[in-house]
Amino acid sequence: MIFDIAGLAQVASGSARSYTPRLLGRVQFHPPYPAWTHTFQPMFKRRLAWASDEDTADNCKDAPKLVWLLDIRAETNPVIIGTAPLHADDGARCKAGGRFGAHNLHPNVPGPLYKRLENTTVASWFNGGVRLFRAVESPSGVPDAPPHVEEIGYYIPEAPPKNPSGTVQINHAIVDERGLIYANDRFTGGLYILRYTGRVPLD
């Protein structure tokens, strides 16, 4: 959903006591895909957005839970233009234990401690680890051809000791202002601090 929240400035200034955001547009892809959406993260300069589902069941009982790329140039009519690719062996992760599928995305929070990502996103994927995706312009040369999603990196830790699922369960992934990635396991694995070393920029 995309809302007009311009009226919040009046609340902040004290000229209005309350404000009800106005719905501008929405995209509905649950169904046919299983609900529900967890995170919506715009890339404002490109007028694109990432949206992640939330996996909530073990062993892919609510699969697939994906990361989507949307065109939000027309705020009243957001359109899905791509999905993040899966690995060839991801089917095996459905049987490995615990959850497998999309969850959180790095938030583009204003302030000095978060890296502002306008072309990429970093996603938590439970036993699929941490996955990095980029919205890549079409090489076709066709005007206004939509970008597509490419994976530019991933990290899947070993199963932490005593994790009840028998697998890692990466729950969050956040990128700081230096480009370091902080990811946590939702049970016993603690915090992982990662440095991206790929050739494609994490920007």
Language model features with spans:
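Feature marking well-ordered beta-strand scaffolds used for ligand recognition
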Residues: 1-203
